[in-house]
């Protein structure tokens, strides 16, 4: 039992060593990779929704360090599905942004396909739903939501907007804090900076269109606050 625990701990350390290489935080292939149990590495990557991220690094390994052919084919098959999912999410994000702008709302895609652009390969991130911030205030936004999709349950910072196969969450505010005083400060700051985020238009890869996404400076605070909140509620994985 002790040997298994040590082995798993060692594999976890190898995983994090290799992950740094996969996201190009380090340039050299980690020495520890030669001790990788690729079935264990695959299981960790799948659990953390990082299949595509690790494959990006695996493609750069010499043959003697790479997974066996059968596992590699399975890995590549899943990564190809992730690639296709990203294409759909890029296209859907463009549609959603366009539709809301047509309705007179300034908007900004939070996390999601905006975060995908921060990866070495924008198709390597496992996508989820579409989180979109709308300017205009909770009351005005809910009037529109209730007109288009009646009977949606409003939460403090967002409401579901089931208008396509891809799940959409419409945000009145990007984030919040639990402690009222801290949340007041955060909402004040968000009120000052969200105009800039809605104006930050970027081009998606391969001509899929344009969307508004947060600036890197904004994401430094926003993503960390999102992680902080999830640690105390739903839990959080490594994929962002």
Q: Regions from the language model: what does each represent?
A:
Residues 2-128, 133-240:
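Conserved NTP-donor binding/palm subdomain of two-metal-ion nucleotidyltransferases/polymerases, i.e.
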């Amino acid at each position: 039992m002790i040997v298994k625990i040590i082995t798993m701990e060692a594999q976890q350390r190898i995983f994090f060593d290799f992950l740094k290489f996969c996201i190009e935080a380090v340039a050299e292939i980690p020495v520890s990779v030669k001790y990788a149990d690729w079935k264990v590495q695959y299981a960790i990557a799948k659990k953390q929704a990082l299949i595509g991220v690790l494959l990006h690094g695996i493609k750069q390994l010499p043959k003697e360090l790479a997974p066996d052919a059968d596992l590699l084919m399975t890995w590549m098959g899943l990564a190809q599905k992730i690639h296709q999912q990203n294409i759909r999410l890029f296209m859907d994000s463009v549609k959603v942004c366009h539709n809301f702008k047509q309705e007179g709302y300034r908007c900004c895609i939070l996390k999601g396909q905006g975060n995908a652009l921060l990866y070495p390969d924008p198709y390597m991130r496992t996508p989820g739903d579409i989180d979109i911030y709308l300017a205009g205030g909770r009351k005005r936004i809910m009037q529109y939501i209730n007109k288009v999709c009646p009977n949606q349950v409003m939460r403090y910072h967002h409401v579901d907007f089931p208008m396509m196969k891809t799940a959409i969450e419409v945000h009145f505010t990007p984030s919040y804090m639990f402690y009222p005083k801290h949340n007041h400060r955060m909402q004040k700051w968000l009120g000052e900076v969200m105009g800039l985020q809605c104006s930050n238009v970027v081009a998606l890869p391969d001509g899929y269109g344009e969307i508004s996404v947060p600036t890197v400076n904004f994401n430094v605070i926003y993503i960390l606050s999102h992680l902080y909140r999830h640690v105390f509620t739903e839990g959080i994985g490594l994929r962002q």
